[in-house]
Regions:
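Alpha-helical, largely C-terminal catalytic domains
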Residues: 1-162
């Protein structure tokens, strides 16, 4: 039973992971706040898709995927985007590191419960469209952060917003 507690204890560490580490910030943001915002945006995108464009996406599933989309960073930390995408070799190595981190988190759970979380933490071919929505929500969240920083007079974010 203590295995379960290890997983949730690790999940609770999400609030200690700071984002935008290479940037001067007028307001610091942690991964917990970011995950909630991305979840809310992803849910909204799903609702808008269904109501305005006659779609059939499950907004609740989007919200859950988005809620957990960056949990690997509990182990890896938040690698700044310019570093993460500097070249294909670094990008591929970091993606592998993130995958290993997700698998490490899943190993903290009994098999029956890990099965549920595996479908949330690990991208599935059958849900590629949902993951595209999560990525879009993540990008919108970054745009919101840049806009907020610019409104507060932090010109350092002007290049990122472009």
């Amino acid at each position: 039973m203590s295995e379960i507690y290890s997983f949730y204890a690790m999940m609770s560490r999400i609030k200690y992971i700071h984002r935008w580490g290479l940037m001067k910030n007028t307001r610091n943001e942690n991964l917990s706040e970011h995950s909630l915002e991305v979840s809310m945006i992803a849910h909204a995108l799903g609702v808008i898709n269904n109501k305005r464009f006659d779609g059939s996406i499950n907004p609740e599933r989007l919200a859950v995927l988005a809620m957990f989309h960056d949990v690997s960073e509990i182990i890896t930390g938040d690698l700044p985007t310019p570093v993460k995408y500097d070249n294909r070799k670094i990008t591929n190595a970091y993606k592998e590191l993130e995958e290993q981190a997700r698998l490490s988190l899943l190993k903290m759970l009994p098999d029956d419960i890990a099965e549920v979380y595996r479908s949330i933490l690990c991208e599935d071919e059958n849900e590629l469209l949902l993951w595209k929505y999560v990525k879009a929500a993540d990008t919108i969240s970054a745009l919101i952060k840049c806009t907020e920083e610019l409104i507060m007079g932090n010109a350092e974010y002007s290049k990122i917003k472009q």
